[in-house]
């Protein structure tokens, strides 16, 4: 079993962590994130190091411990560096463009799809067929990218659709005639 929960989280310069009744606030150069952690996990902040402790070694406690540590580490990385998810579009006439904070996608439907940026999320469109989702909250960045991908999932015959950058789409052969 992984022992990720026992690892110490080292805070980069400019990142400040406060804990009040297991509601942890992480402030950094890119913004501020707040999250409530389970009451069974004890969070200790000592200078530039944060450690999490569990009350016992039951399987349930180990899973909660590792998840809480990973969530807190993602908050620290988010406010210091941020997260980004890149998507690419394949298909004839598939294109993306920004209208203010709104992302407008033409993906072979009779109407364009419009995606509003959730709070703390920004979109970039470096080329007409590339989309970059940026933000400080890893979960929201991933959910937003997954929603955009879900608007036109890559199909296995021609590979048309929206995919993550570097994603491998398994291809199938079409029907063969008689």
Curated annotation (Swiss-Prot):
GO terms for molecular function: rRNA binding; structural constituent of ribosome. GO terms for cellular component: cytosolic large ribosomal subunit. The keyword Ribosomal protein applies. PROSITE patterns: RIBOSOMAL_L6_1. InterPro entries: Ribosomal_uL6-like, Ribosomal_uL6-like_a/b-dom_sf, Ribosomal_uL6_a/b-dom, Ribosomal_uL6_bac-type, Ribosomal_uL6_CS. GO terms for biological process: cytoplasmic translation. Keywords: Ribonucleoprotein, Ribosomal protein, RNA-binding, rRNA-binding. Belongs to the universal ribosomal protein uL6 family. Part of the 50S ribosomal subunit. This protein binds to the 23S rRNA, and is important in its secondary structure. It is located near the subunit interface in the base of the L7/L12 stalk, and near the tRNA binding site of the peptidyltransferase center. This is Large ribosomal subunit protein uL6. It comes from Streptococcus mutans serotype c (strain ATCC 700610 / UA159). The gene is rplF.
């Amino acid at each position: 079993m992984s022992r990720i929960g026992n690892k110490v989280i080292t805070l980069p310069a400019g990142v400040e962590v406060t804990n009040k009744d297991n509601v942890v606030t992480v402030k950094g150069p890119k913004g501020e994130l707040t999250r409530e952690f389970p009451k069974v996990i004890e969070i200790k902040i000592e200078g530039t190091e944060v450690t999490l402790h569990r009350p016992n070694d039951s399987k349930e406690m180990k899973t909660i411990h590792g998840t809480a540590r990973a969530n807190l580490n993602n908050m620290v990385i988010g406010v210091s560096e941020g997260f980004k998810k890149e998507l690419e579009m394949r298909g004839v006439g598939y294109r993306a463009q920004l209208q203010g904070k709104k992302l407008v996608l033409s993906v072979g439907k009779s109407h364009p799809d419009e995606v509003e940026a959730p709070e703390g999320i920004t979109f970039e469109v470096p080329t007409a067929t590339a989309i970059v989702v940026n933000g400080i909250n890893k979960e929201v960045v991933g959910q937003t990218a997954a929603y955009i991908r879900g608007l036109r999932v890559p199909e296995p015959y021609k590979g048309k659709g929206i995919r993550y950058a570097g994603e491998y789409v398994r291809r199938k052969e079409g029907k063969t005639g008689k």
